[in-house]
Amino acid sequence: MRIIVNPTKKINGAALAPSSKSHSVRGLLLAALADGTTELTNVLESDDTSAARKVVEALGARLNVKKNNEFGNGLDIEITSTGILLTISQKIFTGDSGITTRFVLPLLGLRKNSDMPVQIDCSPQMRARPIKSFIETLNCLGMKIQSLNNSIKIQN
């Protein structure tokens, strides 16, 4: 097969990828680790991303959330953080968000005030999901995670 591609005029512009729950949650949690202000555009508006936003705030970051009027279907979020995670709240609720729960557990080991215990709770649906092997792995790495009846207690 032989294909010939002739040059055309320069293409200029931007393409906006559809919002993704997975990318949105990861972006929010990574922004909490950054020192300074991170801007996320077209963040998916969902229960999982709402849970992730609350977790990021509980870890000491400030969020400025605006509806994305340019494209009309996502959120624009400015996350300001020192890059040093602090536990502002002794209880963190992750709702139904498995990705938030699993990502925040190791992040809690990086807290400046990691000697202060923090309790993670989630929905009954999430409590039914397996997480024991993940907790055991994190404990082997030096974290002190204790599985309670309906929540998880973390202290380093």
Ranges and model annotations:
Residues 1-156:
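Structural preference for solvent-exposed beta-strand-turn elements
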